[in-house]
C-alpha cells in the first residue's frame, strides 16, 4: 500500500525529464504557476471532506440510509464548490495579469477539479477500502502520463499538458464514482438540507486549517509569480519538485511505518512514547540529514539528469533547498507523531497560523530584496520555525503530561 502511494507521486514526477525538455524553462514555469494557482481552487473543493466525511462515513457505516445521504450530500457540496471555483476563476483575469495573458492554460488546468468532485476518496477511506482508492489514483496518474508522453511533442502544445492530465482525472473520477455506487449499492440521490448542512459544518474547521497550511506550503510560488519571470518560476519549480519528491520518498514511508508503533507506545505511557520518539528522531533525522547532504553535493548531477542543461540556474536553488528533507522529517515527527501522540493536537492550528503569517511575510519582504533565493530562505525558515514551536510545546505541555 505504501509503495503504491509513493508510486502515485513518482509517476508524474518521472514525466518531468521529458516534458521539461520539451517545454523549456519558460513554458514549464507558466504551467507550474497555473498548477499552483489552481491548487487553491482544489483546496476549496476538497474543503476538508477527505477527513470530515471520511469520519462521518466510518461512524455511520452500519447505517446505509445515513451513509447514502452523506455520500450525495458531499457530492452536492463539492459540485456547488466547483461552480464557485469556476466563478472565482472567471474573475481572476481581472485581478492577475498572468491569468489574463493565458486564460486557456488556467481553464484547462482547473478542469481537473471536475474529477476531484466525482472521485469519492473520502467514502473509500471511510469504509476502509484504501487499496481501491490507491489503485484508482495510480491509474489516474498512469493514464495522464501515457497521454502526455504520447501527445505532447513540441513546446507549442504546452496547454495540452494540463488538459490531458485533467482529462485523465475526470475519466477516472467518474469511473470511481460509478464503481462506488454499484459496488456499495448506493441509492438514488436524496438530498436533505440538514445532512448538507452537517457535512459542510463538519468540514469547515479542517478547511480553515488547510488554508493556513497552504499559505506556507503553496504561497511561496504564488508570491514569486508577482516578482519573477516565467523562466525563473520554471527554475524554482524544477528544484522544488525534486525536493518534494525526496520528501515523499524519505519522509512518508518513515511516518507511515512509525505511526502505529508510536501510537501504541504513547497509549501504554507518555514516558515510553517520548523515549521511542527520541530514538526515531535520532535515527530518522540522521538518515534525512544524509539525504540533504547528498542533495547538496549532487545538485548539478540531479538537475542535469532531470531537466537538462537548460535548467542550470536550478542547481543553485536546489542547493539552497537541500536542508528541507531534514527539516521536514524532524517537523513531521514532532508534529504528527509528537503532538498527536501526546494528545496536544489542539495546538496544531495555532502553529499553522503562525507559520502562515511568518512565511507570507518573509516572502513579501525578501523577494523584492534578493529575488528567488528569498523564497528558498522563507521555506527553510518556516520549517525551522515549525520544529522550534512544536519542540517548545512538547517540552512545556508534554512534561506536565508525563508527570501526571
Where are these regions (language model features)?
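Signature of the first transmembrane helix
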Residues: 1-50, 86, 145, 204-231, ...
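Membrane-water interface segments that mark the loop-to-transmembrane alpha-helix transition
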Residues: 1-8, 34, 39, 46-93, ...
Amino acid at each position: 500500500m505504501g509503495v503504491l502511494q509513493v508510486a502515485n507521486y513518482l509517476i508524474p514526477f518521472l514525466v518531468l525529464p521529458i516534458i521539461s525538455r520539451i517545454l523549456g524553462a519558460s513554458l514549464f514555469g507558466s504551467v507550474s504557476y497555473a498548477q499552483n494557482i489552481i491548487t487553491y481552487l482544489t483546496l476549496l473543493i476538497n474543503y476538508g471532506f477527505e477527513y470530515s466525511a471520511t469520519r462521518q462515513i466510518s461512524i455511520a457505516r452500519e447505517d446505509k440510509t445515513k451513509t447514502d445521504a452523506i455520500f450525495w450530500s458531499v457530492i452536492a457540496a463539492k459540485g456547488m464548490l466547483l461552480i464557485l471555483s469556476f466563478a472565482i476563476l472567471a474573475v481572476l483575469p481581472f485581478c492577475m495579469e498572468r491569468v489574463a495573458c493565458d486564460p486557456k492554460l488556467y481553464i484547462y488546468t482547473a478542469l481537473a477539479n471536475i474529477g476531484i468532485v466525482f472521485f469519492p476518496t473520502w467514502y473509500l477511506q471511510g469504509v476502509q477500502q484504501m487499496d481501491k482508492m490507491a489503485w484508482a489514483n495510480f491509474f489516474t496518474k498512469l493514464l495522464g502520463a501515457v497521454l502526455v508522453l504520447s501527445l505532447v511533442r513540441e513546446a507549442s502544445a504546452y496547454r495540452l499538458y494540463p488538459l490531458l492530465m485533467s482529462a485523465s482525472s475526470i475519466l477516472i473520477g467518474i469511473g470511481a464514482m460509478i464503481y462506488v455506487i454499484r459496488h456499495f449499492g448506493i441509492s438514488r440521490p436524496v438530498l436533505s438540507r440538514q445532512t448538507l448542512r452537517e457535512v459542510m459544518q463538519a468540514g469547515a474547521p479542517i478547511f480553515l486549517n488547510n488554508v493556513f497550511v497552504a499559505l506556507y506550503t503553496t504561497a511561496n510560488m504564488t508570491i514569486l509569480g508577482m516578482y519573477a519571470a516565467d523562466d525563473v518560476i520554471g527554475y524554482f519549480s524544477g528544484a522544488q519538485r525534486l525536493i518534494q519528491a525526496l520528501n515523499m520518498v524519505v519522509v512518508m514511508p518513515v511516518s507511515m511505518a512509525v505511526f502505529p508503533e508510536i501510537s501504541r507506545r504513547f497509549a501504554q505511557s507518555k514516558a515510553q512514547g517520548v523515549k521511542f520518539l527520541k530514538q526515531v528522531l535520532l535515527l530518522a533525522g540522521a538518515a534525512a540529514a544524509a539525504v540533504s547532504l547528498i542533495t547538496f553535493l549532487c545538485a548539478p548531477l540531479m538537475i542535469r539528469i532531470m531537466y537538462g542543461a537548460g535548467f542550470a540556474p536550478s542547481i543553485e536553488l536546489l542547493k539552497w533547498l537541500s536542508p528541507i528533507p531534514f527539516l521536514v522529517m524532524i517537523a513531521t515527527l514532532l508534529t504528527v507523531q509528537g503532538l498527536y501522540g501526546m494528545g496536544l493536537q489542539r495546538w496544531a492550528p495555532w502553529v499553522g497560523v503562525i507559520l502562515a503569517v511568518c512565511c507570507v511575510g518573509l516572502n513579501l519582504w525578501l523577494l523584492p530584496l534578493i529575488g528567488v533565493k528569498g523564497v528558498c530562505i522563507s521555506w527553510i525558515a518556516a520549517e525551522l520555525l515549525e520544529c522550534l514551536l512544536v519542540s517548545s510545546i512538547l517540552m512545556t505541555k508534554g512534561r506536565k503530561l508525563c508527570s501526571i
